[in-house]
Amino acid sequence: MIDYRLEAPPILRDFLVYHETIQGHSRRTVDEYFLDLRNFFRFLKLDKGRVARNTPLGQISIDDVDLDLVGSVTLSDVYAYMNYLSRDRVVHPNSPDARNGLSAPARARKVAAIRSFYKYLTNKAKLISENPMQDLDSPHLKKSLPRYLDLEESVSLLEHVDGANQARDYCILTLFLNCGLRISELVGLNVTDVR
């Protein structure tokens, strides 16, 4: 398990601590921000010639990332990074069906992390005077409606509930089907919430 408090350079660690303690983001969200920004800074160091051109991205340290590097980033740098993500980044490198290019939603999440980092540096930490990511657009995402079960599919699903926790599982599925709950909402549900 990663611990950004030990691995992140100070400028990045301060941002991540802010998100976890002040913004109240979950540890998992903050860890994902760290991974996204670590990869971005690795790419920047490679792209700006701060490491040898043939250095594998995963072997580039970000310990020396500081305000000079962060402050030199332009929209063009981020567009180059997005191009790398969409064409060259290996998806699931240890998988037998590894392919190149991240999906638009995956790239959009990375854009959100970069945008949030620069917003923090500008508005909260006041380390840079102008936010270079203010005009950064997210990749276009196709809007799709959720797929719903029809009545017969819902009945069939409920009829196939069995096992040691049949009553509990039936109740959970009934809540999902009738209330449209998300998994996080269901997990956070307490007996006292039900009237």
Task: List the model feature ranges, each with a label.
Residues 1-195:
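Conserved catalytic core of the tyrosine transesterase superfamily
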